[in-house]
Amino acid sequence: MAAPFDAFFATARPGPLGQRLCIWHAPHDGSAPKSLIVFIHGFAEEMNKSRRMAALQSRAFAAAGHAVLQMDLLGCGDSAGDFGDATWQDWIDDVVDAVRIARARHTQSWPGAAQPALWLWGHRMGCLLATAAAPRIEGGCNFLFWQPTPNGKAVLQQFLRLETAAALMGKAPPAGRPSAKDGLAAGSGVEVAGYRLSPGLAHGLEAARLAPPASGANRRMEWLDVAPQAQDAASPVAQQVLTTWGSAGWSARHRSIVGPMFWQTTEIEDAPDLIATSSSALTSGAVRLGSPCFVDTAVAA
């Protein structure tokens, strides 16, 4: 029987920055998993705020018969390197490596069992990384998106605003030092809210889009949004993205869940309805495979 939970360091690539912290969740009953899920965390402090929710969801998936791999990206959490060491391409490579590690762990745990369907489960910025890495993943994948951002430019702008917020609170940078935006434009690394940001990460993030991979036939994309109050429908921006995915052959579905926006709350909070909806999304038969686009907004109570 496979160990239900295991934390370990894996070598993503050679060199001093190659070690990645991984957490493996196997199906609780020890059977071969229904699917293989790789979690891709959010950006900077959003990752830290979401640690608990990611762990709770991973355990829920394992209890439902799925296998999950969580991996800290380069410079994040307990993986090698500092945040400022990472580029956008490094993180894309990490997602590809995480899939390789997860598949190898599956083969080791259940020799002879066929590789199950693969899901890339992203949170916020992690959704952008998932779509960027997908063309390099053999056999294709499905997507589970938690509060995805349609483009990385918005993520970067929101992060850089933290510098302005700090200045308003009397924590302005030293006189004569360029703003973070100007520093990045000049090709220099900058520090914002305690995080060192490299130009290679900032520029790659800024150019990222939530674009559908080409191989969409018989593939699924589940988009789950969380809001404090019930939402009648997906936002116009989300609807446009969903339509684009549907036109590319993906079966795309949106659902809105009532709950706290845990990745930005002051205190660590849980969104139990998001966990329940995510677990059901992987097995729900409501998605019509091959349809241009199916948008089903269901608000959890």
Model-inferred region functions:
Residues 1-35, 297-298:
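N-terminal cap/lid segment of alpha/beta-hydrolase-fold proteins
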Residues 26-72:
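Short, surface-exposed "cap/lid" segments of acyl-processing enzymes
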Residues 43, 67, 72-77, 149, ...:
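Short beta-to-alpha linker loops that shape the active-site pocket of alpha/beta-hydrolase fold enzymes
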Residues 53-54, 82-88, 268-269:
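Short glycine-enriched, charge-decorated loop/helix-capping segments at active-site entrances
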Residues 76-110, 114-115:
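Catalytic nucleophile-loop/oxyanion-hole region of alpha/beta-hydrolase
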Residues 119-130, 147:
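Gly/Ala-rich beta-loop-alpha elbow adjacent to hydrolase catalytic centers
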Residues 132-136:
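Active-site signature of alpha/beta-hydrolase-fold catalytic machinery across serine-
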Residues 137-275, 279:
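The alpha/beta-hydrolase serine catalytic core
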